[in-house]
Design a protein with these regions (language model features):
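Glycine-rich phosphate/pyrophosphate-handling loop used in enzymes and phosphotransfer proteins
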Residues: 1-161
């Protein structure tokens, strides 16, 4: 089932699917099993979400410790696969922290707000890329750092806002 466009903290978020069923399984295989080939399949669904204004793709990086643990940065894999299809560059503008407490899931524990540092200037027409949007706080933090107001994700779940 397709997810409707939404605005989260001033960021327009376009998602290919709701975070359920087969789409959720694809995200899980990419994110936690490091099946990198999933990114190519997922990019097929993401390409129509890019507008003509998209001039560069900026993946929202996974925390370094999780990249090591799971062997993949899902947003970078998606951005790379999508860039090949759309023939636009990937620019790694954002630097993630080494480690932060886990935010995803249903735990009622207080959330740690994500933050990023800018590695290189953000190009005009940059589109943020991530695998899934839940509350939108990660996208908003990335947007605050880069200035980009458009994000493309494979799936969307969680609260709207």
């Amino acid at each position: 089932m397709a997810a409707p466009d939404q605005v989260r903290g001033g960021v327009l978020v376009r998602s290919a699917f709701a975070h359920e069923g087969a789409a959720r399984l694809l995200v899980h295989r990419l994110k936690y099993e490091a099946v990198a080939g999933m990114a190519n399949r997922m990019a097929v669904a993401l390409e129509p979400l890019l507008g003509v204004e998209a001039k560069a793709l900026v993946p929202i990086p996974r925390v370094i410790a999780r990249r090591w643990k799971y062997g993949i940065d899902p947003a970078a894999a998606l951005a790379t696969a999508l860039a090949r299809r759309a023939e636009i560059p990937v620019v790694h503008c954002l630097r993630a922290h080494f480690w932060v407490r886990r935010r995803a899931g249903t735990s009622a524990s207080p959330r740690i707000l994500p933050s990023f540092r800018l590695r290189v200037p953000t190009p005009v027409g940059a589109v943020l890329i991530d695998d899934v949007v839940t509350t939108g706080t990660t996208l908003v933090a990335a947007s605050s750092t880069t200035g980009s107001r458009l994000a493309i994700t494979f799936t969307a779940s969680g609260s709207r806002g």
